[in-house]
Amino acid sequence: MGALCTLWLGLVLLGVLGALQTSAQAQVSLQPNFQQDKFLGRWFTSGLASNSSWFREKKNVLSMCMSVVAPTADGGLNLTSTFLRKDQCETRTLLLRPAGTPGCYSYTSPHWGSTHDVWVVATNYEEYALLYTAGSKGLGQDFHMATLYSRTQTPKAEIKEKFSTFAKTQGFTEDAIVFLPQTDKCMEENK
């Protein structure tokens, strides 16, 4: 009887955890009819929101960076970002692997070794893209980030407002949302 109760309890817990996971993922929608070929090219990281302790510590010294999105042979994307770090330009490339539905990708964090999921939530391809990233940095350390990409270094006020609204719907507070200041440094590296 005890083993049966333990088995039942385990199944209930799995069901609850599965429902919680589905509920969290259901909050993030994808850009309808995502067209990867229109998403390619140069983007500027204009806004960020994150629950990461690293982000909270560094958000006041971050500046805008440039990223170039290029296709891979397997249908994924290379996301090459150039940013200012300790007065020098640094470039990093992430391989975003297709993860089912168009606009959904995954990558392995070079720092943590964990897998993160990335969703292209909304884009008009010509001005802005809203992305949401979720993953884990270890046991009990869930990582969430909202990103505003813009095709120019000066996104329109309504695009910034759209990003703020999106970030807040994902549970980020006002103080966790940052619009990155423009810089002339490291903006020509990936052209």
Curated annotation (Swiss-Prot):
Signal peptide feature range: 1-24
Annotated S-S bridges: 89-186
GO biological process, alphabetically ordered: mast cell degranulation; prostaglandin biosynthetic process; regulation of circadian sleep/wake cycle, sleep
EC number: 5.3.99.2
Active site: 65
Cross-referenced Gene3D superfamilies: 2.40.128.20
Residues carrying sugar: 51, 78
Keyword terms, alphabetized: Cytoplasm, Disulfide bond, Endoplasmic reticulum, Fatty acid biosynthesis, Fatty acid metabolism, Glycoprotein, Golgi apparatus, Isomerase, Lipid biosynthesis, Lipid metabolism, Mast cell degranulation, Membrane, Nucleus, Prostaglandin biosynthesis, Prostaglandin metabolism, Pyrrolidone carboxylic acid, Secreted, Signal, Transport
PTM entry text: N- and O-glycosylated. Both N-glycosylation recognition sites are almost quantitatively occupied by N-glycans of the biantennary complex type, with a considerable proportion of structures bearing a bisecting GlcNAc. N-glycan at Asn-78: dHex1Hex5HexNAc4. Agalacto structure as well as sialylated and nonsialylated oligosaccharides bearing alpha2-3- and/or alpha2-6-linked NeuNAc are present.
Keyword match Transport: yes
GO terms, molecular function: prostaglandin-D synthase activity; retinoid binding; small molecule binding
Subcellular location: Rough endoplasmic reticulum; Nucleus membrane; Golgi apparatus; Cytoplasm, Perinuclear region
Function recorded in the entry: Catalyzes the conversion of PGH2 to PGD2, a prostaglandin involved in smooth muscle contraction/relaxation and a potent inhibitor of platelet aggregation. Involved in a variety of CNS functions, such as sedation, NREM sleep and PGE2-induced allodynia, and may have an anti-apoptotic role in oligodendrocytes. Binds small non-substrate lipophilic molecules, including biliverdin, bilirubin, retinal, retinoic acid and thyroid hormone, and may act as a scavenger for harmful hydrophobic molecules and as a secretory retinoid and thyroid hormone transporter.
Domain notes: Forms a beta-barrel structure that accommodates hydrophobic ligands in its interior.
SUBUNIT field: Monomer.
Similarity comment: family membership: Belongs to the calycin superfamily. Lipocalin family.
Protein name: Prostaglandin-H2 D-isomerase
Lineage: Eukaryota, Metazoa, Chordata, Craniata, Vertebrata
Gene for this chain: PTGDS
